[in-house]
Amino acid sequence: MALIRDRKSHHSEMSKCHNYDLKPAKWDTSQEQQKQRLALTTSQPGENGIIRGRYPIEKLKISPMFVVRVLAIALAIRFTLNTLMWLAIFKETFQPVLCNKEVPVSSREGYCGPCPNNWICHRNNCYQFFNEEKTWNQSQASCLSQNSSLLKIYSKEEQDFLKLVKSYHWMGLVQIPANGSWQWEDGSSLSYNQLTLVEIPKGSCAVYGSSFKAYTEDCANLNTYICMKRAV
């Protein structure tokens, strides 16, 4: 009987236990997650600039187009600076003064002008560079229509700015068929201390190149030309 009572008592105790609402304990993980995130944001970058942790941060990627644009801007700035530098050198060397005003005779040493509008005045001579291409005869006629003649070299010292000319232009120098000598438009003979003449076959007219060098050429060829006249 005692054994039966003990079993009933044990069964009663077990029933009471089953009647309890036994649920698994819940842990408040919000604070733990905040600590982990804070640790990630304050961690020092490791190798390759990556922060190691539960939430890895990707590497910073630079677009190729961004690099191309930066290089293009840098080249544009460099080109602009070079252009400004050469313009300053050109201005200082050529001194392209457009002479439209009379100056006192007493300042004859620095006198220049007057010249027609848009002509270059240098050492009391007026020059105009024409970009249209013509034959030698057409170029001569164009200069005559403007009361001028094709370029003549008479002094390296006074025409020093012409040494910077790079392209080829008709000048007022032609070969006389009778004796093969070279003369200027005004009939004066070429002096070889004025410029160096490089002769080629079948060339009876001359173009001015640079550094006081002239090259013979067929008069029927098309070239740009330079007109010149004395300033009044």
Swiss-Prot record:
Disulfide cysteine pairs (residue numbers): 112-121, 115-126, 143-227, 205-219
SMART domains: CLECT (SM00034)
Residue intervals on the Cytoplasmic side: 1-66
Domain of life: Eukaryota
MF-aspect GO terms: carbohydrate binding; identical protein binding; kinase binding; MHC class I protein binding; MHC class Ib receptor activity
Membrane-spanning segments: 67-89
Membrane topology: Single-pass type II membrane protein
CDD domains referenced in this protein's UniProt entry, alphabetically: CLECT_NK_receptors_like (cd03593)
Keywords: Adaptive immunity, Cell membrane, Differentiation, Disulfide bond, Glycoprotein, Immunity, Innate immunity, Lectin, Membrane, Receptor, Signal-anchor, Transmembrane, Transmembrane helix
The protein's name in its UniProt record: NKG2-D type II integral membrane protein
InterPro entries found in the cross-reference section: C-type_lectin-like, C-type_lectin-like/link_sf, CTDL_fold, NKG2D, NKR-like_CTLD
Chain positions carrying an annotated carbohydrate: 137, 147, 179
Disorder this protein is connected to according to its UniProt record: Involved in autoreactive CD8(+) T-cell-mediated development of autoimmune diabetes.
Subunit structure: Homodimer; disulfide-linked. Heterohexamer composed of two subunits of KLRK1 and four subunits of HCST/DAP10. Isoform 1 (via transmembrane domain) interacts with HCST/DAP10; the interaction is required for KLRK1 cell surface expression on activated CD8(+) T-cells, but is dispensable on activated TYROBP-expressing NK cells. Isoform 2 (via transmembrane domain) interacts with HCST/DAP10 (via transmembrane domain); the interaction is required for KLRK1 NK cell surface expression and induces NK cell-mediated cytotoxicity.
Disruption phenotype: Mice display no visible phenotype. According to PubMed:18394936, show normal development of NK cells, B and T cells but display enhanced formation of aggressive tumors. According to PubMed:19631564, exhibit developmental perturbation in size of NK cell subpopulations, increased proliferation, faster maturation and increased sensitivity to apoptosis of immature NK cells, and lower cytolytic response to KLRK1-sensitive tumor targets.
Signal peptide segment: none
Extracellular side: 90-232
Entry keyword annotation includes Disulfide bond: yes
Job of this protein: Functions as an activating and costimulatory receptor involved in immunosurveillance upon binding to various cellular stress-inducible ligands displayed at the surface of autologous tumor cells and virus-infected cells. Provides both stimulatory and costimulatory innate immune responses on activated killer (NK) cells, leading to cytotoxic activity. Acts as a costimulatory receptor for T-cell receptor (TCR) in CD8(+) T-cell-mediated adaptive immune responses by amplifying T-cell activation. Stimulates perforin-mediated elimination of ligand-expressing tumor cells.
Compartment list: Cell membrane
One Gene Ontology cellular component: cell surface
Expression tissues: Expressed in natural killer (NK) cells, activated CD8(+) alpha-beta and gamma-delta T-cells and natural killer T (NKT) cells (at protein level). May be expressed on dendritic cell (DC). Isoform 1 is strongly expressed in natural killer (NK) cells. Isoform 2 is weakly expressed in natural killer (NK) cells. Isoform 1 and isoform 2 are expressed in stimulated, but not in unstimulated, CD8(+) T-cells and macrophages.
Domain C-type lectin: 122-228
Other remarks in the entry: Is not capable of signal transduction by itself; isoform 1 operates either through the signaling adapter protein HCST and isoform 2 through both HCST and TYROBP signaling adapter proteins. Some families of ligands for mouse and human KLRK1 receptors have been characterized being very similar in structure and highly likely to be orthologs. In humans, an additional distinct subfamily of ligands (MICA and MICB) differs structurally, having an extra MHC alpha 3-like domain.
